[in-house]
Curated annotation (Swiss-Prot):
Disulfide bonds: none
Gene Ontology molecular function, alphabetical: proton-transporting ATP synthase activity, rotational mechanism; proton-transporting ATPase activity, rotational mechanism
Native source species: Rhodobacter capsulatus (Rhodopseudomonas capsulata)
Protein keywords: ATP synthesis, CF(0), Hydrogen ion transport, Ion transport, Membrane, Transmembrane, Transmembrane helix, Transport
Membrane topology: Single-pass membrane protein
Protein name, per record: ATP synthase subunit b'
Gene: atpF2
Transmembrane region(s): 39-59
PANTHER family in alphabetical order: ATP SYNTHASE SUBUNIT B, ATP SYNTHASE SUBUNIT B', CHLOROPLASTIC
Function: F(1)F(0) ATP synthase produces ATP from ADP in the presence of a proton or sodium gradient. F-type ATPases consist of two structural domains, F(1) containing the extramembraneous catalytic core and F(0) containing the membrane proton channel, linked together by a central stalk and a peripheral stalk. During catalysis, ATP synthesis in the catalytic domain of F(1) is coupled via a rotary mechanism of the central stalk subunits to proton translocation.
NCBIfam families: PRK13454.1
Amino acid sequence: MANETNAVEAAAAVAGHAAEAAEKGGMPQLDFSTFPNQIFWLLLALGAIYWLLKNIAIPRIAAILADRAGTISGDLAAAEQYKLKAKDAEAAYAKALADARAQAQKIIAETRAVIQKDLDAATAKADADIAARVAQSEVKIAEIRAGALEAVQIVATDTATAIVTALGGKADMGALNAAVGQRVKG
């Protein structure tokens, strides 16, 4: 019950203040009798806000901005260093690649020279071997012409034997002599 009594008294007090304000009329902010007091508190509040901004907020913001600017400039400097290192690495890579290509070309040229030398030697040997065989063949041809029919038959038999052997067969001498004799005679 005591609470209800207090609530009723509070409501009556508020109603009394409202009635008093209604009698004065107008808005309290526009009451010229309170302007000096309002101006004082306005200036005091603005001064406090100015002091807080000047001494606390703006220095903190400036420190954060300076820290960011330092970080950004440091990052840009590091990026520039990395860029220079990358250019140096690229130049070194290009030089190494060019050196490797030159070395490869040199090795290729040396290998070609060695192969050509070996090929020339093999060709010369083959030419000499062919020339020797040609000379031997010419001697045999001269002997065959000089030795007449019997020599032709011997050479033909030897040639047929060599051909059969070269082809991987076994030469039957009797059959070969008969075949060669028949061909030579006619």
